[in-house]
Amino acid sequence: MHEYIIQGGFPVNGTIKASGNKNAALPCIAAAILSEEPIILKNIPEIEDVFVMLQVFEALGGHYEKIEKNVFKLQIEKVKTSKIPEDLATKIRASILFAGPLLARTGKAVLPPPGGDVIGRRRLDTHFLALTELGARVETDQNFSFIAHKLMGEDIFLDEASVTATENAIMAASLAEGTTIISNAASEPHVQELCKMLNKMGAKISGVGSNILTIEGVKKLNGTEHRIGPDYMEIGSFIGLAAVTRGQLKITDVEPRDMRPLRVAFGKLGIGWSLEGTTLTVPDKQKMQVNCDLGGMIPKIDDAPWPGFPPDLTSIMTVIATQVEGTVLIHEKMFESRMFFVDKLIGMGARITLCDPHRAVISGPSSLHGSELVSPDVRAGMAMVIAACCARGESIIRNVYQIERGYEHLVERLKSIGVKIELKEK
């Protein structure tokens, strides 16, 4: 077990490169099941979740090798089993992403209930709906078993714009017979990334970036090389870190289009940045002040499917709001347990009223003090790191495995921009 020891109160300064998008890397790894040929993935973040997905890929009969930093070669000439090992499935929710590819390649997929962050009720019904529409039969006992003699294209309307259910449907439909239309599809950048990779492999997917996808099934998918785009969730986290520590930070390898929803939400808290090409600069000593809605109403920051504000950043925004002059409502619509970490911020000196499991009213600025904290999930854990960096004194954060599931070489990279952080073995 490891823990972070952070001395707060120091501004960040310098340049940091954005890592590859974790939420794009995971489905792209699963999609390698769809071809017998080699897949080379570049800009893959070297984080816990990626390595667990690679272990699942290997357990199914695949082989992978690290060619160089952040570049991996994957190949699975023959699938030796269609069952995900239970010990790996329980480590990561994204193991569900192997259902569609296994079903398309072998006609069967057996998955133990997936693990991952405990941030509320995370239903799997939309996955079942999509795959059964394509011709699969679902059996449930201790595991979820998907069986299909032949997948057939279908007109599918998803009951929610689930990212992973959309990705499963896309992968299964790519090798199905006939044409599939997916309505109410998720359109997040990582879904677009998967579609781009599959099209390079020979898939025929149109409507990429919209909520209606058309997929013409093909008989075979080929190998390819694909570079994963930058992680806008990580970029948003670093913007927040710079703002609350009053430092100047340059973030390189940014995709400007991904930043538009973030600019709107951060702007409500008086936080801005400049973009020059793919380099984003957060200026120091910004006047962080809540911009009230018309009529002087308290502004609301709420999450929504893309191109709305991403739910993975609501924890980060909650911490930022504690350092902004004024009052704001944070409304986490999607996950009812994500806001429960705010009691730790209150213990550090934040003024927060938790209205219900989905909503919190934050008034600032508050002077935070160091504390002992336990990371409940990857995003709340990073929010705690940001809180510790702007707090007075020393903070200790435990269960940092959760944070390192989503943030690459975090301690090393934070040190490079001036954060007083140490990794200690407990």
Curated annotation (Swiss-Prot):
Biological process annotations from GO: cell division; cell wall organization; peptidoglycan biosynthetic process; regulation of cell shape; UDP-N-acetylgalactosamine biosynthetic process
Disulfide bridge partners, by residue number: none
Catalysed reactions listed for this entry: phosphoenolpyruvate + UDP-N-acetyl-alpha-D-glucosamine = UDP-N-acetyl-3-O-(1-carboxyvinyl)-alpha-D-glucosamine + phosphate
Cited InterPro entries: Enolpyruvate_Tfrase_dom, Enolpyruvate_Tfrase_sf, MurA_subfamily, RNA3'P_cycl/enolpyr_Trfase_a/b, UDP_GlcNAc_COvinyl_MurA
EC number: 2.5.1.7
Domain of life: Bacteria
Keywords: Cell cycle, Cell division, Cell shape, Cell wall biogenesis/degradation, Cytoplasm, Peptidoglycan synthesis, Transferase
Active site residues of this protein: D117
One Pfam assignment: EPSP_synthase
Coiled coil segments of this chain: none
GO MF terms held by the record: UDP-N-acetylglucosamine 1-carboxyvinyltransferase activity
Residues annotated to bind phosphoenolpyruvate: K22, N23
Subcellular location per the Swiss-Prot or TrEMBL entry: Cytoplasm
First-listed, main subcellular location of the protein, grouped into a coarse class: cytoplasm
Metabolic or biological pathway: Cell wall biogenesis; peptidoglycan biosynthesis
UniProt keyword Cell division present: yes
Binding site for UDP-N-acetyl-alpha-D-glucosamine: R93, D312, M334
One CC-aspect GO term: cytoplasm
Function: Cell wall formation. Adds enolpyruvyl to UDP-N-acetylglucosamine.
Family as reported in the entry's similarity comment: Belongs to the EPSP synthase family. MurA subfamily.
Name of protein: UDP-N-acetylglucosamine 1-carboxyvinyltransferase
Organism: Treponema denticola (strain ATCC 35405 / DSM 14222 / CIP 103919 / JCM 8153 / KCTC 15104)
